[in-house]
């Protein structure tokens, strides 16, 4: 288990035959001033990781970013007595045998223990959500992006989406946040160069047009930089 930054712990599980050989990742958020200890998209924890989590303080909340990332959530809910919540739009996709272990749901625009819920439209599941911590400038994603060892970002194969073009365009909202650390549910997370990696990704996305603006003169008030033109507006 790696501490990415103060109170942000990250652990990885490797599974043979997984997509492109990437790891499945879980995130644990603890720290002073945080209302809850939050475990996100947890793969199974090994004995050492369980001891580490217990030493930090058992999680009180388990957040699942999409229906396909339930993973070891129900098992860890039982072990730690934590509440488990899922995206409201994915609630019907939770397997029936686990439905009784879901304690609640959430929707875009809500806040979970200080984390802003960011709705990601037209993804693999309708409830796919990002979790943004403004204090840490930390974004946590489930299946929305995959990280490669070289620091590049990619999508799941087109076959995973009902409309791949809309799925790509649906990630535009990620450029609306200041992100210093990008934690991914699959593959390599980024602790530096996040903005550059996102811009490199979107430059290869035909559904998204980027425009560089000067301070106070862009589509949004605020600092200079790259902004997204919504092509459907």
Model-derived features: where do they sit?
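Short, hydrophobic/aromatic-rich segments at coil-to-beta transitions
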Residues: 5-12, 113-118
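Metallo-beta-lactamase
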Residues: 15, 35-39, 45, 116, ...
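Residue-level marker for the onset of beta-strands and adjacent loop->beta junctions
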Residues: 25, 106, 127-129
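Active-site HxH/HxHxD metal-binding segment of metal-dependent hydrolases
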Residues: 44-112, 208, 215
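Short solvent-exposed loop/turn micro-motifs enriched in small/polar/acidic residues
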Residues: 19-22, 101-104, 122-125
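C-terminal regulatory/interaction regions
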Residues: 215-233
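Pre-active-site segment of Zn-dependent metallo-hydrolases
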Residues: 10, 16-61
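Short acidic-hydrophobic surface loop/beta-edge motif
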Residues: 2-4, 29, 107-113, 131
């Amino acid at each position: 288990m790696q501490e990415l930054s103060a109170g942000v712990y990250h652990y990885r599980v490797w599974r043979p035959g997984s997509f492109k050989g990437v790891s499945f990742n879980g995130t644990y958020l603890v720290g002073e001033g945080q209302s809850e200890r939050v475990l996100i998209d947890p793969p199974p924890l090994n004995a050492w990781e369980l001891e580490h989590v217990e030493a930090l303080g058992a999680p009180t909340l388990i957040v699942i970013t999409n229906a396909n990332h339930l993973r070891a959530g129900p098992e860890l809910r039982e072990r730690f007595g934590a509440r488990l919540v899922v995206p409201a739009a994915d609630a019907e996709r939770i397997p029936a045998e686990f439905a009784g272990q879901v304690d609640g749901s959430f929707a875009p625009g809500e806040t979970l223990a200080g984390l802003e819920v960011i709705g990601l439209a037209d993804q693999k599941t309708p409830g796919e959500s990002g979790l943004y911590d403004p204090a840490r400038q930390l974004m946590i994603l489930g299946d929305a992006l995959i990280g490669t060892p070289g620091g590049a970002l990619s999508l799941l194969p087109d076959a995973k989406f009902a409309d791949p073009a809309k799925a790509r365009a649906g990630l535009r909202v990620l450029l609306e946040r200041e992100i210093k650390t990008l934690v991914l549910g699959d593959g390599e997370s980024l602790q530096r160069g996040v903005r550059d990696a996102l811009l490199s990704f979107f430059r290869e996305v035909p559904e998204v047009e980027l425009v560089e603006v000067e301070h106070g003169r862009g589509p949004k008030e605020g600092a200079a930089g790259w902004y997204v033109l919504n092509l459907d507006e």
